[in-house]
Amino acid sequence: MEEYVIYTDGACLGNPGPGGWAAVIIQRGTNEKIISGREADSTNNKMELLAVIKALESFEQKGKRVTVYTDSTYVYKGITAWIESWMKNKWRNSSGGAVKNKEMWVRLHGIAAAHTVRWLWVKAHNGDHYNEIVDRVARKEAASFTNCEPE
């Protein structure tokens, strides 16, 4: 089984505001590919989710062994701890409110189920090479709406 490592990040200038996402997909021992995109009106959490979704959807075949690194506690806890309860509780959170970004969570859950995924959280802005790359690309995507460079 082919093994991949994915680093993802999302950024938003304002919340809501212009957003960008990025992922680097590393096939062990062979190559790296960076994918990215933007939305004119989004939130940081949507961009974080979209980065992971787009990275996993980029595989043409199911059944990949993937390690996903995210610096988003929202994504990490959502997919590893909260989603099963949300589904069991008809997409209600622990406070009884509707889960935000439900459609994106459903999409992520479905695509992740097609692969063997290990989820890992990485501290942001802590010198991790690939995390820094996706952070820079995501911020650049978000900034492209304002014709300014991110800080």
From Swiss-Prot:
Its EC number is 3.1.26.4. Mg(2+) 2 binds at residues 9, 135. Its cofactor is Mg(2+). It is found in: Cytoplasm. Binds 1 Mg(2+) ion per subunit. May bind a second metal ion at a regulatory site, or after substrate binding. One of its GO terms (molecular function) is magnesium ion binding. Pfam families: RNase_H (PF00075). PANTHER family: RIBONUCLEASE H1. Belongs to the RNase H family. HAMAP family: RNase_H. Monomer. This is Ribonuclease H. The gene is rnhA.
